[in-house]
Amino acid sequence: MRYWVGVASRDHVLLGVAGGFCQVCHGKQAPLARMKQGDWILYYSPKTGMNSGEKVQAFTAVGQIVDDRVYQFRMAENFEPFRRDVVFQDAPHPCPIEVAREHPEWRSYAKQLRYGHFEVSHDFSEHIYRYMMR
């Protein structure tokens, strides 16, 4: 089992939670293919909207990958992003970036946020998960 962070606006994360899916890196297939059934994904949201909105700077969702299927979904005539099915946990408390900064591995992960999708340790994932589920 592996643990991942996806970066997306809170609005987009909430659409995924409601629909039971994840998308990362503007719908690219390759990052999704690295995840396997049973892996966990934490979503970090810098803002409420994709190109605008208020600062969020928090982990806003956590879920487990359902199967090994990566599929395309037609959102618009010229936009068919790739998705994975996810069972999201009912995580009542978004985890602010300040809590993530308390973890010793945060410095190395902070630099990777700009990539939109990256692997993290079980320990870091648990640090965030415990806060979200408290």
Task: Annotate each predicted stretch with a short phrase.
Residues 1-5, 10, 24-30, 70-134:
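Contiguous surface segments at macromolecular interaction interfaces
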Residues 15-24:
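Short, polar loop/linker segments at the starts of domains and inter-domain junctions
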Residues 19, 51-54, 76, 99:
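A generic "cationic amphipathic patch" detector
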Residues 35-36:
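Short, well-ordered loop/turn sites that connect or cap secondary structure elements
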Residues 44, 68-71:
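Amphipathic alpha-helical interaction surfaces
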Residues 45-50:
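Short, charged beta-turn/beta-strand-edge "cap" motif at the junction between a beta-strand
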Residues 52-68:
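Short beta-strand-centered aromatic/proline hotspots
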